[in-house]
Amino acid sequence: MKRLASALALMGSCVLATTVVSTPASALETYEAQMEASDAASQARVDMLEAFGPKVLKPGQYLWRDVPDSAGPERVVISLSDQMAYVYRGDTLMAATTISSGRDDKPTPSGIFSILEKMPMYRSKKYDNAPMPFAEFFEPHGIALHAGYVGTEPNSHGCVHLPTAFAKKLYGITEVGTPVIIGA
């Protein structure tokens, strides 16, 4: 957890430093960052068991519990191998859901990112004007967390599809700068 906090702090200083030269530093996609993200995804599985018990979610299902704002800032952890998203407030897991990430030919990037922009309803400029409700962009080339079809395997063009009700709740608690940690 300390290594993850250090990586997030480094990312924050990169964002601050690059703001001066107008180059968004939204991500750490280094090997080390990818390993940190994978560790965070592994820990999230353990935290889910402790927080919610031995629940098995079907595609489109989610769990959400109230956690006081005073617990700390939010962060999103994505496990690509499990096709799951986890939401923390501080060190407390508050939510978990099934997802659909990028297909093999359009993979979701792994590493440590932050939300760059939020749009309640966006339409894809790349994919036939496809709707992207509750879009939270974490990558400058249009990859986002958003409401979309959640099946049993990866099926997106790189985005992270979330169940609609979950995406709406997540959109309501995050802000630009919220960390998005994506591990294998």
Regions found by a protein language model. Name each.
Residues 2-134, 141-184:
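N-terminal pre-domains immediately preceding structured catalytic cores
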